[in-house]
């Protein structure tokens, strides 16, 4: 790793730690805006690094304290359904069945885009690996079990791959990151599609479980010869390498802000979209194939008009001022046409009837 890369990684890690510390330090809103309503949310760990920064910044800007529990997309949807939080975070769009269980209809509000990366710990290998979706699927199915297996070696000529067992690490909780990962594998691998399939929680054939993106990253970091999947920001924060993945155009693409943006450019959403879309395996030579929107799930009406306004105002701030902070934390900002759709959608949210 170059000294420039190390400085960049340290900067990102310090930025994230500062953001999390700032969230923890937020206390009672300043007296001049003490009437602002506080908000509670829970859900996805995938976007937590940028949400931490946003919530800290918005507390300073607007005096609104937002308490967000990074517990995984499945847990966030469950708490939203039970009515114990004001909003939820999820990388997986809600299914029709999940939405039918809600007391109040919700909007899917995309916030940023990110990449799920295939990260690993190979002490002998310093050059980034190249992998295909089919090979990744066979590794996580337990069919490919050695790092020097022919399927991996053919993709990485010249690399001295060790004859070591591959130790698979996956999520143990209900996870939007797992949803994105399994959505991609189901798209490119018949074996995966007919096996574990797509979902926030899976029956894993092999491997160790880690809770949250941070749990998987930590497990991979401390386990030689392991492989896992995490959001790009978590790999960078933990100084973990990640593979280039062969995309739909046949190009090996490194996950980055630019390649995630290219994946989003491969689709055009209509003004009537509900944003429940997949962009995995998107067309285009520059597109990273395991890319996704992440969402805040926002009730269309709330019992408290004050909270409704506070949440809507925060979202309007996030899709404008907040988007500018996305690249520093390894997320891609929303395309401008998506922001334009969201502006109209947020204006349409009904105000709560009670204060």
Spans of features found by a protein language model:
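A short, flexible low-complexity segment enriched in Lys/Arg and Gly/Pro that occurs
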Residues: 11-16, 85
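N-terminal secretory signal peptides that target proteins for export/translocation
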Residues: 1-11
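Compositionally biased regions
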Residues: 4-5, 15, 19, 195
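Bacterial N-terminal signal peptides
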Residues: 14-28
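Flexible loop/hinge segments at secondary-structure junctions
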Residues: 30-355
């Amino acid at each position: 790793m170059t000294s420039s890369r190390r400085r960049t990684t340290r900067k990102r890690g310090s930025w994230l730690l500062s953001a999390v510390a700032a969230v923890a330090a937020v206390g009672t809103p300043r007296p001049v805006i003490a009437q602002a309503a506080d908000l509670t949310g829970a859900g996805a760990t995938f976007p937590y690094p940028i949400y931490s920064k946003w919530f800290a910044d918005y507390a300073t800007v607007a005096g609104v304290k937002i308490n967000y529990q990074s517990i995984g997309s499945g847990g966030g949807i469950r708490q939203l359904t039970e009515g114990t939080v004001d909003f939820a975070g999820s990388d997986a769009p809600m299914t029709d069945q999940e939405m039918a269980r809600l007391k109040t209809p919700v909007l899917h509000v995309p916030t940023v885009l990110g990449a799920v990366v295939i990260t690993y710990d190979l002490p002998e290998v310093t050059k980034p690996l190249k992998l295909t979706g089919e090979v990744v699927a066979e590794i996580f199915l337990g069919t490919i079990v050695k790092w020097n297996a022919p399927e991996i070696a053919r993709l990485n000529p010249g690399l001295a791959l060790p004859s070591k067992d591959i130790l698979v690490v996956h999520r143990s909780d209900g996870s939007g990151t797992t949803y994105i990962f399994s959505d991609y594998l189901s798209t490119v691998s018949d074996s995966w599609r007919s096996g574990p399939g797509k979902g926030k929680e899976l029956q894993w054939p092999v491997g160790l479980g880690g809770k949250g993106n941070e749990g998987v990253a930590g497990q991979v970091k401390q386990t030689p010869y392991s492989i896992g999947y995490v959001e790009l920001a978590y790999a960078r924060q933990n100084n973990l390498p990640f593979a280039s993945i062969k995309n739909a155009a046949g190009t090996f693409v490194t996950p980055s802000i630019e390649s995630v943006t290219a994946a989003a450019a491969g689709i055009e959403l209509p003004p009537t979209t509900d944003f429940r879309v997949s962009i995995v395996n998107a067309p285009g030579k520059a597109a990273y194939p395991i890319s996704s929107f992440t969402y805040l799930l926002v009730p269309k009406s709330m019992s408290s008009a004050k909270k409704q306004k506070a949440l809507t105002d925060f979202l309007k701030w996030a899709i404008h001022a907040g988007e500018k902070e996305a690249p520093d934390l390894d997320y891609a900002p929303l395309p401008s046409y998506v922001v334009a759709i969201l502006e109209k959608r947020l204006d349409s949210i009904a105000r709560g009837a009670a204060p």
